[in-house]
């Protein structure tokens, strides 16, 4: 169960793709685009301190198994030994922005290792961002298993 939770936490790595040289969504406010890029790097590098800044204290993940995960569990999943994630492409992207908030999501096939064991899972997900006290943070993520293309 711990492995499954770690796998599903990886879904929030929305912008982790091969083509990182360009901004993922130039229509986003610069501060949000920067936070998204930092969040991406923090997940890929297992940077717990950065994740701690970029996840809201009241962050919640509803994973594809119907389990609920909080900020501490999410950070643990990304910083645990034997965890890695390969770059991936997001399909059917959803990008919505309004003053103080945003939804970023899509469908991705994720591959990597969790607790040293390989995994591959296809998920549809949504990350909810909020601007609080002048900084952008992820406040909520939902993940659902997606059918094969």
What are these regions (language model features)?
Residues 1-6:
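Bacterial N-terminal signal peptides that target proteins for export
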Residues 8-9, 19:
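Cleavable N-terminal signal peptides
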Residues 22-55, 60-149:
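A beta-strand edge to alpha-helix "cap/lid" segment located at domain peripheries
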């Amino acid at each position: 169960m711990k492995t499954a939770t770690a796998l599903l936490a990886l879904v929030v790595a929305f912008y982790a793709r091969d083509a990182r040289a360009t901004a993922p969504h130039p229509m986003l406010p610069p501060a949000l685009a920067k936070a998204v890029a930092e969040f991406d790097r923090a997940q890929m590098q297992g940077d717990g301190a950065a994740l701690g800044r970029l996840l809201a204290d009241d962050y919640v993940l509803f994973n594809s198994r119907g389990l609920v995960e909080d900020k501490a569990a999410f950070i643990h999943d990304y910083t645990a030994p034997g965890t890695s994630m390969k770059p991936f492409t997001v399909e059917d992207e959803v990008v919505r922005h309004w003053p103080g908030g945003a939804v970023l999501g899509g469908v991705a096939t994720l591959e990597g290792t969790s607790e040293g064991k390989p995994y591959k899972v296809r998920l549809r997900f949504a990350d909810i961002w909020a601007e609080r006290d002048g900084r952008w943070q992820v406040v909520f993520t939902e993940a659902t298993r997606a059918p094969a293309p």
